[in-house]
Amino acid sequence: HNIYEKVYPASTTKILTCLIALERGNLDDVVTVPKASDITVAGSSMADLKPGDQLTLRELLYGLMVPSGNDAAEAIAYYIAGDSDKFAELMNEKAAELGATHSHFANPHGLPNDDHYTTVYDMYLIFNEAIKNDEFVKIACTPEYSCTVRNEEDAEQPERTVSWTNGNAFLSGKFSFADNMQVLCGKTGHTNAAGFCLVLGETAGDGHRYISIIMNSPIYEQLYASMRNLASKSQQ
């Protein structure tokens, strides 16, 4: 339904952010979290990172995809492109390259911006490309992740452990998935403008992969019930 209609992607944006980072970055590089990661927008999902924190790009990508950290998204954008505006240019270039021509990205995390939008079909194209990357699938299917963060600027706590839980309720086990189907990986999203969103890759019992996308669901529980129904239908 309405696969070409303009929608707000919210944090499903991070699928593209992760894909670009995997293509352009070195997973073992140590990245320093910039001041721009100190996001104070109410309700903003965070990975509990502070400016000056140091962690590898690989760890940052878990911080991006597991707890949906907007702070991690900013840090990745600065590492790859120097700032988030330049990173957004890379996002739009990549989207165009994949044929996602009815999208425009203005930031790496998906916080509300009138100039930041996509369509279900474009999001399918982007996610379909992302799941060709084994590292992407590995990161985006992880229910929980912990890592050690270092910060030389923090005299009281130069080293600490951060732990993240995936917001995808199918991965956390909060909701059961369709019979004879297994969740491959996915990304959630939510803002008032975008509603509740979920982009999901799943594997059927016969090994076939499917992609299911729901955007702008008004109710959290309804999103997961609808997604389970959608995934069940793909086998009929």
Annotate each PLM feature.
Residues 1-121, 130-131:
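Active-site-adjacent loops and short helices of periplasmic peptidoglycan-processing enzymes
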Residues 83-236:
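Penicillin-recognizing serine hydrolase domain
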